[in-house]
Regions:
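C-terminal regulatory/oligomerization modules of transcriptional regulators
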Residues: 1-8, 27-41, 46, 55-58, ...
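Pre-recognition alpha-helix immediately N-terminal to the DNA-recognition helix
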Residues: 11, 22-24
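Short helix-coil-helix linker/hinge
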Residues: 15-20, 80
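Histidine-centered divalent metal-coordination motifs
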Residues: 21, 52
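Short, Lys/Arg-rich nucleic-acid/phosphate-binding segment
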Residues: 66-72
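Conserved catalytic core of two-component histidine kinases
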Residues: 75
Length: 113
C-alpha cells in the first residue's frame, strides 16, 4: 500500500468511525439533501452537522454543490465501493494469515503425537 492510498484509507475509515457521519452518508447516498435539512435530523447544532459533512467531503464520500443560498450534499457511491474493496483486501490478507496459523498448529500437533 502506498503512502497516498494509506492516507486515503485513513481518511475514509476516520470519516466512517462516527455514527452520525455514517447516518449522514446513508441519507445522502439515498438522495441529495441540503445541509440545513440534514441538520434538523440531529440533536446538535447546524455548525456541528456542517463539520461532519466536511469530514465526509474531505474523505471523498460525498460532494457538495451550491443551489442559491443552500448547500446540497450527495453521496459518492464510488468512494463507498473503494471502502468495500479495501475491506475485501484486508479480509483476504487475514484469511491467509489465519490459514498459515492453522497449518502451524496442525504441524505442532503432529510433532507432539
Amino acid at each position: 500500500m502506498t503512502d497516498e492510498s494509506a492516507d486515503r484509507a485513513d481518511a475514509l475509515f476516520h470519516a466512517l468511525a462516527d455514527r452520525t457521519r455514517r447516518d449522514i452518508l446513508r441519507r445522502v447516498l439515498a438522495g441529495e439533501h441540503s445541509i440545513s435539512t440534514l441538520a434538523v435530523k440531529y440533536d446538535m447544532s447546524f455548525t456541528a452537522v456542517q463539520k461532519h459533512v466536511a469530514v465526509l467531503e474531505k474523505a471523498g464520500l460525498l460532494t457538495k454543490r451550491r443551489n442559491g443560498r443552500e448547500q446540497l450534499a450527495r453521496g459518492y457511491v464510488e468512494a463507498v465501493r473503494s471502502v468495500a474493496s479495501m475491506l475485501t483486501e484486508l479480509e483476504r490478507v487475514w484469511r491467509g494469515r489465519i490459514a498459515r496459523i492453522d497449518v502451524l498448529i496442525a504441524s505442532d500437533s503432529d510433532q507432539e503425537d
